[in-house]
Amino acid sequence: MYKTIIMPVDVFEMELSDKAIRHAEFLAQQDGVIHLLHVLPGSASMSLHRFAADVRRFEEHLQHEAETRLQTMVGHFSIDPSRIKTHVRFGSVRDVVNEMGEELDADVVVIGSRNPSITTHLLGSNASSVVRHATLPVLVVR
């Protein structure tokens, strides 16, 4: 199947990832590696010089919380945990997914999407952005 799978997740909305987990596992059947990726918003500290230290501390707290939740998510998979890598990065989801795809020479992105609404049209805003700007195949799971 696939050797390198990137799975962007929102650790603060884990229910979006439940179905995507099963699809990612299926694609990684033989010996594929799943890279769970949580992307935090880019820093605003450049425009908030007076609060830069507080912003940094808050970002560190968010990063630690995201890493902890990603480790919890690893337990939801049925494949060997050594085949699941976790990553927390800062930036926009679409840019980080593309950057990581190049870094890892990834084969596919598997992303969960919420039910359609008038504001997100057919996909969630992050899933939609990833699909529109992807440089590799994307499987969107509802």
Swiss-Prot record:
* Membrane-spanning parts: none
Gene3D superfamilies per record: HUPs (3.40.50.620)
Pfam families according to UniProt:
Usp
Q: Where is the signal peptide?
A: none
Name the PANTHER family for this protein.
Answer: STRESS RESPONSE PROTEIN NHAX, UNIVERSAL STRESS PROTEIN UP12
The similarity annotation says: Belongs to the universal stress protein A family.
- Name of this protein: Universal stress protein G
Annotated source species: Salmonella typhimurium (strain LT2 / SGSC1412 / ATCC 700720)
Q: Which gene encodes it?
A: uspG
